[in-house]
Every structure is written in structure tokens, then in C-alpha cells.
Design a protein with these regions (language model features):
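Helix-rich terminal scaffold detector
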Residues: 1-71, 161-165
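Active-site phosphate-binding and catalytic loops of NTP-dependent enzymes
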Residues: 74-84
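Non-DNA-binding regulatory cores of transcription-related proteins
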Residues: 82-146, 150-151
Length: 165
């Protein structure tokens, strides 16, 4: 019998699960709050998709919600107020100067919080790894595809010493 006359399943093809993170899920307190807010928003989207009987959307949203809930459950909150003040660690805001004299500010955060456009980089990024443990005045090499870039650490700040976010 030809497939032309057989009924296709109304159930969408199963989506593969989203892969869990390969590294510990370190987050700032604000990062955990963001994950929880995203989870709550996703639950609302899922309820709306269920109400309109959108099977494909329900499947995708349920998968994403399982992944997000696992990220929340696995979160390891690092309180920046307890970090060492004299060297770069998780939740530090670091002021650096490159070889051309340009000054940039980077904040080291969890994978789910990272947004290079706003100056937040993941703790597992090459930049954060290069800065980890550095002190004011230290020069580090930031490995980049275009070649390593030397950076001088000008300042290190942590949450209790920053202006309000």
C-alpha cells in the first residue's frame, strides 16, 4: 500500500533533550533569580500553548522547561561579598587596560548570565580564565583567535563595593 493513503501521526516528532552543562553551574544570586524568572515565564508560555492545543509548542516548551529547571536545581550560588578582595574570582568586576590603552570593564558570572555585550563573561570563558587569580597591576594574556592580547588589571571590585546594579 502506498504511503499516500496512510494517516500521518498527529503527534510531533520527539525533540532531543537539551544537553546539560558540562561544568558546575555557578551563578550569582542575581543569576539564580534570573533563572527562576525565566522558568516562571516559560511555565506561562507552556500553559498558553496547552490552552491553544499547540502540540509542537508544548513539546518544545516542556523540553526547555525541564532543562531550565535542572539548571536551577544544579545551581551553585556564589556570593561575591565573600570572595577575596585582592584578586580576581567569580563575580568580580575587573577593569583592564589593553596594549593600545583602551580600558574595559568585565564582570565574571555564570554561564547562563553571560552577555559579552553588557560586559559579563562566563567564568569558563578564555578571558575569565586568563583573569582568574590576577591582582591589581598584574598583566595577563587573553588567548584569542586573532592572537593573545595582553591586559593589565587596573581594578577589582565585588558586589558590596560596586554602585547598585
Amino acid at each position: 500500500m502506498s504511503r499516500a493513503f496512510t494517516r500521518e501521526s498527529d503527534t510531533p516528532e520527539a525533540l532531543p533533550e537539551r544537553a546539560p552543562g558540562a561544568h558546575p553551574n555557578y551563578v550569582t544570586p542575581a543569576g539564580l533569580a534570573q533563572l527562576r524568572a525565566r522558568s516562571a515565564a516559560l511555565r506561562q508560555e507552556l500553559a498558553a500553548a496547552q490552552a491553544r492545543a499547540d502540540a509542537a509548542a508544548v513539546q518544545a516548551l516542556a523540553r526547555d522547561l525541564r532543562w531550565l529547571d535542572a539548571r536551577v536545581a544544579d545551581a551553585i550560588v556564589i556570593d561575591g561579598t565573600t570572595q577575596p578582595r585582592d584578586r580576581v574570582a567569580f563575580d568580580a568586576e575587573v577593569e583592564v587596560e589593553d596594549a593600545c590603552g583602551a580600558v574595559r570593564h568585565w564582570r565574571i558570572v555564570g554561564e547562563d548570565e553571560a552577555d559579552a555585550g553588557s560586559g559579563s563573561v562566563s567564568w569558563i570563558s578564555p578571558l575569565a580564565r586568563a583573569l582568574a587569580g590576577a591582582r591589581v597591576g598584574d598583566e595577563v594574556l587573553w588567548p584569542r583567535p586573532a592572537g593573545a592580547q595582553p591586559l593589565t588589571v587596573l581594578a577589582i571590585r565585588y558586589p558590596d563595593a560596586r554602585t547598585p546594579r
